[in-house]
Amino acid sequence: MNLVDIAILILKLIVAALQLLDAVLKYLK
């Protein structure tokens, strides 16, 4: 894996975490 692949993987993980957080916040309200 090169740095570009790692950066893309990290960005995808961040986006998934933000979507999960948003879903949890909507569920709690």
From Swiss-Prot:
Disulfide bridge map: none
Gene Ontology biological-process annotations: DNA damage response; dormancy process; SOS response
Example of a GO MF term: monoatomic anion channel activity
Predominant cellular place of this UniProt entry's protein: membrane
UniProt entry tagged with the keyword Cell membrane: yes
A GO CC term attached to the entry: plasma membrane
Entries under Pfam families matching the protein: TisB_toxin (PF13939)
Phenotype on disruption: Competition experiments between isogenic strains with or without the tisB/istR-1 region were performed. In the presence of DNA-damaging agents deletion strains were disadvantaged and were almost extinct by 4 days.
TM helices/strands, residue ranges: 6-28
Induction (free text): Part of the SOS-response regulon, controlled by LexA; repressed by LexA, induced by DNA damage. Antisense sRNA IstR-1 inhibits toxicity by inhibiting translation of tisAB mRNA; subsequent RNase 3 cleavage leads to a truncated mRNA. IstR-1 sequesters a standby ribosome binding site in the tisAB mRNA; as the levels of IstR-1 decrease during the SOS response this site opens and ribosomes are able to bind to initiate translation further downstream.
Cell compartment(s), UniProt: Cell inner membrane
InterPro entries: TisB_toxin (IPR025211)
Membrane association type: Single-pass membrane protein
Entry keywords, A to Z: Cell inner membrane, Cell membrane, Membrane, Toxin-antitoxin system, Transmembrane, Transmembrane helix
Job of this protein: Toxic component of a type I toxin-antitoxin (TA) system. Overexpression causes cessation of growth, induces stress-response, a number of membrane protein genes, and leads to cell death. Inhibits ATP synthesis, ATP levels drop drastically quickly after induction. Part of the programmed response to DNA damage; damage leads to increased accumulation of the protein which slows or stops bacterial growth, probably allowing DNA repair before cells continue to grow.
Protein known as: Small toxic protein TisB
Source organism: Escherichia coli (strain K12)
Higher taxonomy: Bacteria, Pseudomonadati, Pseudomonadota, Gammaproteobacteria, Enterobacterales
